[in-house]
Amino acid sequence: MKQTPQIRLVFTLTKRDGTDFERDAVTRGLGISPTRSCPPTPGKGKVQHSGKEIREPDEQVLPGFTVLPAEAPPYPTLRHAYWSAELPKMDCRALDEPLQQLEQMLCGKEAEVRRLCEEYSLYADLTVRVFAASNDLPELVLPDGSVAFWASVGATVSFDFYLD
């Protein structure tokens, strides 16, 4: 029996410099309770090798983490502080339904998201997580209205695929 693909959308505001921010102010400003919210925390794992010696904190090696300098590998990591609003996994054959749902949640709050990002030096991200068989992916179309909406929020859009 074929399984319907699933999509989960995650909107995240992240502080990438190793410091915390007023996550409660984000909740108040947006009027949305976060699904998850976390201060900077030490990563559980360590980076064995990044192809170069790490002498200063490096955010480019591992998304969501800063790799901290050390005398030699393994390098410790620090998970960035973040605030996120996630939709539950949805069985769907196209991205449009969950995308519209998240956009409705944030509609009218675009300027507030940009203000919070500026005030607290945050990065806005929309992550589209797709759970599917490799030969049964959903339709992943970003209509022009959605592209304009996420651009107005200042969000980077990325896709994570979890394939069977």
Q: Model-found features: residue ranges?
A:
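Acidic (Asp/Glu-rich) sequence patches and key acidic residues
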Residues: M1-A148, S152-Y162
